[in-house]
Swiss-Prot record:
Organism: Schizosaccharomyces pombe (strain 972 / ATCC 24843)
Gene name, Swiss-Prot/TrEMBL: rps23
Chief localization: cytoplasm
Subunit architecture: Component of the small ribosomal subunit (SSU). Mature yeast ribosomes consist of a small (40S) and a large (60S) subunit. The 40S small subunit contains 1 molecule of ribosomal RNA (18S rRNA) and at least 33 different proteins. The large 60S subunit contains 3 rRNA molecules (25S, 5.8S and 5S rRNA) and at least 46 different proteins.
Protein known as: Small ribosomal subunit protein uS12A
Keywords: Cytoplasm, Hydroxylation, Nucleus, Ribonucleoprotein, Ribosomal protein
Database matches in Pfam families: Ribosom_S12_S23
Residues spanning the membrane: none
Modification 3,4-dihydroxyproline, positions: P62
Amino acid sequence: MGKPAGLNAARKLRNHRREERWADAHYKKRLLGTAYKSSPFGGSSHAKGIVVEKIGVEAKQPNSAIRKCVRVQLIKNGKKVTAFVPHDGCLNFVDENDEVLLSGFGRKGKAKGDIPGVRFKVVKVAGVGLSALFHEKKEKPRA
């Protein structure tokens, strides 16, 4: 059995395609709006939050390291997430109760590399870019 092929087969083809599209994960996610419901960012690319604590996350096997991360409570919805602090020594620029800007980290909302459960990274601290602080182009404002 193949596809219906005939002058009056369009409705059957269209209905079948409509039903089968629900097997596609991207289509289903888009139509049900789960990106807005389930992701902590609520579908947006960046979010601001307040640093709750600094933590070290152990890398997965076969690597052996402690990745420097922070626990952040998002301002928009109060959800707590773990965010990676990139660059060597940049954790020193981040203090508790600082306001940070977070963005995605990794692929399609999943964790990146050997850092388990960490889906976000710190981009700005107290309104200043983390890379600018790292390269000593700017200083963190005094509170």
